[in-house]
């Protein structure tokens, strides 16, 4: 129940009429067995339907994950992102972007060393940026708000950035 695709594959995740496209030089998907002793995750689960033929009858016994290597690109109607590498798990619907990730949402751009994008129903819910975080937001023609720091924690409302907290220098 795993696959490895190279030569610039594209994966499409469909849910409730919305699609998220993930492209990379190489994509891998596999199953991880469910461990009842494992520490519980702190975010809500988000179910998704993929274009893959996956047996979901025994959903409690395994967890699907996706890994993208080199030149990762993510596209959907509420955000776009690029990075060097990606890890995505169906447990918490979190995109973990590594290697100079950049995320665009509406009129905002977020960058940092490592970026975790928490989603719910394929819409961004929260973003956490580790080290060298920077957010740029266009306010008017040729005017921008820029905030940088060690870490950034941002929250979304209706798919748009609503609140941001930046710590450190």
Which ranges hold each PLM region?
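Structural signature for solvent-exposed beta-strand/loop edge elements and short helix-capping sites
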Residues: 1-169
């Amino acid at each position: 129940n795993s696959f490895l695709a190279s030569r610039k594959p594209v994966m499409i995740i469909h849910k409730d009429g919305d699609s998220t496209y993930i492209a990379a030089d190489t994509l891998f998907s596999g199953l991880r067995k469910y461990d009842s002793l494992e520490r519980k995750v702190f975010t809500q689960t988000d179910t998704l339907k993929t274009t893959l033929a996956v047996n979901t009858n025994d959903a409690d016994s395994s967890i699907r994950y996706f890994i993208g290597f080199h030149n990762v690109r993510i596209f959907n109607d509420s955000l776009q992102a690029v990075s060097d590498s990606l890890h995505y798990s169906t447990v918490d619907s979190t995109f973990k972007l590594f290697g100079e990730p950049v995320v665009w949402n509406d009129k905002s751009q977020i960058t940092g060393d490592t970026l975790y994008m928490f989603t719910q129903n394929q819409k961004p819910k929260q973003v956490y940026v580790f080290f060298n975080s920077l957010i740029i937001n266009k306010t008017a023609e040729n005017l921008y708000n820029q905030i940088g720091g060690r870490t950034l924690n941002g929250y979304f409302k209706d798919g748009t950035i609503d609140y941001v907290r930046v710590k450190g220098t």
